[in-house]
């Protein structure tokens, strides 16, 4: 029995990055051998075990063979006869197909270290094209390692295009797709993930609503970058620079989907794109079974981001409706994330990255002004039910009128 450290742990050590998760592969052992040594079985599709002391995962060396469509369409074979090289060749990229023994000796049959030094993401074998999930994984690695100057090998990008055109991406489950998408959006440069999907043809298969934004012009006076797709990439980039959570990044990606529906005759204006885009945002949310918090914020940002930009122009009554829509009294954090998404939208324009966004503080102040209105005096006056709700709304409106008069010249 030989045990090797494999995959990301080896890659990240060679890159000089912190190693967080360690994967182990065991060569020359059977399930019975592992059980005798106290390892606990946890794998369902193939033999994976937990170490009796560290709880780290140890997998028996295995081969795989394509047997159907999609990510799950594989037959796995694990036995003591499977070699380390056979196990490594089934992996996606050469930089992930290296192994180290207990003495730190490197096994690198597919030149992963050479590609790591050359900053190239390259597939290990033609079997890469058998697993559609690898399109998303490579795009995610491109986003993660963009700061190191990594690029995708042309032949690998070709296989990604082949997979995108095959229709197999549609066989991916919502859960698997969302897991990759959400992880990619939280990388340091998530816009690279979307750009790669666009370049290889996967974006039009997975999110045609986002793909449709590329080539759609916007008014140059407000959007020097002009292209809506380029704008969305910039907004997403800003959301990562400012280290916003997944909810904000997802909303940034989807906020302008309505512009993809604007008739060409109306370009570059996009009247009412906030409302026309809502059904598209809803469709994308449902397609990937997106978590509720991400769904809600994406819809709210899609509907109200123009309100955010025009905050200082809004009538107090419209401002109150905006606050009510966000349930700002009970869910202040959601409104704060809305403000963040609006600010990223404003900064995601060429030349506007460092511009101030006074709307942010104005909206925060408005929310605070409305929150300071107490219901207790109204209860003491005997208001109940609908009358109480109406009276509370009127008091908040008064507070917002005062707030606007004090803050807008």
From Swiss-Prot:
Its cofactor is Mg(2+); Ni(2+). Residues 228-329 form the HD domain. It catalyses: a tRNA precursor + 2 CTP + ATP = a tRNA with a 3' CCA end + 3 diphosphate; a tRNA with a 3' CCA end + 2 CTP + ATP = a tRNA with a 3' CCACCA end + 3 diphosphate. CTP binds at residues 8, 11, 91, 137, 140. Mg(2+) binds at residues 21, 23. It comes from the Bacteria. SUPFAM superfamilies: Nucleotidyltransferase (SSF81301), Poly A polymerase C-terminal region-like (SSF81891). InterPro entries: CCA_bact, HD/PDEase_dom, HD_domain, NT_sf, PolA_pol_head_dom, PolyA_RNA-bd, tRNA_CCA-adding_enzyme. ATP binds at residues 8, 11, 91, 137, 140. Its EC number is 2.7.7.72, 3.1.3.-, 3.1.4.-. Keywords: ATP-binding, Hydrolase, Magnesium, Metal-binding, Multifunctional enzyme, Nickel, Nucleotide-binding, Nucleotidyltransferase, RNA repair, RNA-binding, Transferase, tRNA processing. Magnesium is required for nucleotidyltransferase activity. The keyword tRNA-binding does not apply. GO terms for molecular function: ATP binding; CCA tRNA nucleotidyltransferase activity; cyclic-nucleotide phosphodiesterase activity; magnesium ion binding; phosphatase activity; tRNA binding. It holds the Pfam family PolyA_pol. GO terms for biological process: RNA repair; tRNA 3'-terminal CCA addition. Catalyzes the addition and repair of the essential 3'-terminal CCA sequence in tRNAs without using a nucleic acid template. Adds these three nucleotides in the order of C, C, and A to the tRNA nucleotide-73, using CTP and ATP as substrates and producing inorganic pyrophosphate. tRNA 3'-terminal CCA addition is required both for tRNA processing and repair. Also involved in tRNA surveillance by mediating tandem CCA addition to generate a CCACCA at the 3' terminus of unstable tRNAs. While stable tRNAs receive only 3'-terminal CCA, unstable tRNAs are marked with CCACCA and rapidly degraded. A single active site specifically recognizes both ATP and CTP and is responsible for their addition. Monomer. Can also form homodimers and oligomers. Belongs to the tRNA nucleotidyltransferase/poly(A) polymerase family. Bacterial CCA-adding enzyme type 1 subfamily. Comprises two domains: an N-terminal domain containing the nucleotidyltransferase activity and a C-terminal HD domain associated with both phosphodiesterase and phosphatase activities. This is Multifunctional CCA protein.
């Amino acid at each position: 029995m030989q045990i090797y450290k494999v995959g990301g742990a080896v890659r990240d050590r060679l890159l000089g990055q912190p190693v967080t998760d360690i994967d182990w592969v065991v060569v020359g052992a059977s399930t019975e051998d592992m059980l005798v040594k106290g390892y606990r079985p946890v794998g369902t599709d193939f033999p994976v075990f937990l170490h009796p002391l560290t709880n780290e995962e140890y997998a028996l060396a295995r081969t795989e063979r394509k047997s159907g469509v999609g990510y799950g369409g594989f037959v796995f074979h694990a036995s003591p006869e499977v070699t380390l090289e056979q196990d490594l060749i089934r992996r996606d990229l050469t930089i992930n197909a290296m192994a180290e023994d207990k003495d730190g000796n490197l096994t690198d049959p597919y030149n992963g270290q050479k590609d790591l030094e050359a900053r190239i993401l390259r597939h290990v074998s033609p079997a890469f094209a058998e697993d559609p999930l690898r399109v998303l994984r490579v795009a995610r690695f491109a986003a993660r390692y963009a700061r190191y100057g990594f690029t995708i090998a042309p032949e690998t990008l070709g296989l990604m295009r082949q997979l995108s055109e095959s229709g197999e991406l549609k066989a991916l489950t919502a859960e698997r797709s969302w897991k990759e998408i959400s992880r990619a959006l939280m990388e340091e440069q998530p816009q690279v993930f979307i750009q790669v999907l666009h370049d290889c043809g996967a974006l039009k298969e997975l999110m045609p609503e986002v793909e449709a934004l590329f080539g759609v012009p916007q008014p140059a006076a407000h959007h020097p970058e002009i292209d809506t797709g380029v704008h969305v990439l910039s907004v997403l980039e800003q959301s990562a620079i400012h280290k916003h959570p997944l909810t904000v990044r997802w909303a940034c990606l989807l906020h302008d989907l309505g512009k993809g529906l604007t008739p060409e005759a109306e370009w570059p204006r996009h009247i009412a794109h906030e409302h026309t885009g809502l059904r598209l945002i809803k469709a994308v949310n449902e397609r990937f079974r997106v978590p509720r918090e991400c769904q809600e914020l994406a819809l709210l940002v899609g509907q109200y981001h123009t309100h955010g930009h025009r905050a200082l122009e809004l009538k107090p009554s419209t401002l109150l409706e905006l606050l009510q829509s966000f349930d700002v009294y009970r869910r202040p954090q959601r409104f704060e994330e809305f403000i963040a998404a609006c600010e990223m939208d404003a900064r995601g324009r060429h030349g506007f990255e460092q511009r101030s966004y006074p709307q942010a503080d104005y909206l925060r102040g408005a929310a605070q002004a409305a929150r300071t209105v107490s219901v207790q005096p109204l209860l003491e006056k005997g208001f109940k039910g609908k009358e109480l709700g109406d009276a509370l709304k009127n008091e908040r409106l008064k507070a917002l009128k005062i707030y606007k008069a004090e803050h807008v010249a």
